[in-house]
Structure formats: structure tokens, C-alpha cells
């Protein structure tokens, strides 16, 4: 579906480009931002998109979030993360791989579902952290990651992961008020855990 009077195109890197009468003329008193966003009449959206056979377009990820592995492969984190998060046992997944030789992930379990599973397995625990450290829970999440990996290409597969010992929290700056992950902040806060995945 294309809006009347609009043209769409994909740049070589997959960025969605748009032009037409309803595209804005630029940022008010911000010529540099305008120059970076509007080039040769095309609005550079900052979104990576995919065009389908029926000419419809799907937004895949933000261009700024694209990772480039040590091997030079461009990867879209949200594709990998959504595959992992399709598990009911996994609440959040943050993949790491920019400049790295393989993909790893920080995973937050779904407390309610994993705790119900643990009770059904007759496993006793006291805290969220205690639950994430249990061998049975780690094995459960490994099986879920392995299942999700089957739908990913070799370079996208999550090779190692770390279970977060606490739930991501807005007050700690890990997520926004609307619960969107703050990737750069999390990478700083969990640097030790990330580095341990690559040892």
C-alpha cells in the first residue's frame, strides 16, 4: 500500500527512503540535521525496511541499531531478539555482536512463567536471582534458545547467553518509560557479563 503522491525506495543498506509533496521541508533552524535527513529530495527515514513481492514494506529495525560482526556481516538485532523472545519463558533479549566474532545475548526470564514451571518441577527458590542461577532453569532457557536458533542463519545464531539476575527496570535506566530497551545503557551496565561471554 503506497500513499498517493508518495514514492518509496530502499537504499543499498536497506534504509527506507521517501519523497513526495507531504514530506517535510526540513528542521526549523537546524540546517545540519536537515542536510543529514533530506538528500536529493529523499527523506532518509533511519528505518531499515524490507519490500515484499506485493510491493508492501515492513520496517525491520532502526538503522542505528544494525550490528556489524567482526566478520563484516550486517545483522538486524530485532530479528534475532524477536525469535528468542517467541519463547514464553523469555521476557526480554538483548543481543550483542557489534564488532564481535559471534552473537551472544543477555536474557531476562519471564518471572511468572518460569516460576510456575519451577514449581511444577518441584524446584524451590527464594528470589529472582536465585531462580536464574538454577541449573534446571539455565538448561530450560538453553533449549529455548536452541529452538529459536533453528529459524536463524548461522551468523545470526546466539552462541552464548547470560541470564540477567534482575528484571530490567526503568529506575535503573535500563528501559524507557514505555519499557523499550536502552541497548547502549544496558551494554554499559552489563559490560562484565558481556565480556565474560567472549572469554
Where are these regions (language model features)?
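Beta-sheet entry/capping signal
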Residues: 15-16, 56-57, 66, 91-94, ...
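Conserved adenylate-forming
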Residues: 1-13, 21, 101-102, 109-121, ...
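Conserved ATP-binding/catalytic segment of the ANL
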Residues: 2, 6-69
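Conserved C-terminal "lid"/linker of ANL adenylate-forming enzymes
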Residues: 67, 92-94, 142, 146-199
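C-terminal boundary motif of the adenylate-forming
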Residues: 48, 87-113
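Adenylate-forming
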Residues: 23, 37-38, 56-85, 114-134, ...
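Generic, well-ordered alpha-helical scaffold segments in large soluble proteins
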Residues: 30, 37, 48, 83, ...
